[in-house]
């Protein structure tokens, strides 16, 4: 696992935290400011080889992370903290991370009522876990 401190000279464009962090991560690596997209994991990646997540992010529909990752186009997985530090993980590290900090919730009935795997809130324990492995 490696880390990257993200750029501080970046003006937020999105209210949605996931879109903002995806855009910030790309800007930090390339200097490009591009609109965040909404590509399904089996069709493409958030950026280059990366799948980018933060606290409370949805990982996949249902509980089967292995099935989801079998079709995910990403080869590296990024968790970005509230302090805008990116932890870049291999698939094996990401599986361990989601097993430790993922939860299964149910979508509202209005939106189909299906189960989904999500990351929980960012906690001290989560940050310590990442720091110990970086």
PLM feature spans:
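Nucleic-acid endonuclease domains
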Residues: 1-134
């Amino acid at each position: 696992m490696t880390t990257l401190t993200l750029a501080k000279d970046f003006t937020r464009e999105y209210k949605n935290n996931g879109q903002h962090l995806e855009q910030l991560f790309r800007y930090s690596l390339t200097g490009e400011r591009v609109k965040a997209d909404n590509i399904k994991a089996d069709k493409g990646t958030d950026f280059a080889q990366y799948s980018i997540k933060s606290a409370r992010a949805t990982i996949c529909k249902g509980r089967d992370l292995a099935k989801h990752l079998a079709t995910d186009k990403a080869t590296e997985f990024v968790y970005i903290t509230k302090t805008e530090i990116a932890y870049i993980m291999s698939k094996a590290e990401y599986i361990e991370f989601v097993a430790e900090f993922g939860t299964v919730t149910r979508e509202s009935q209005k939106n189909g009522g299906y189960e989904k795997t999500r990351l929980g809130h960012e906690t001290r324990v989560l940050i310590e876990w990442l720091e110990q492995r970086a």
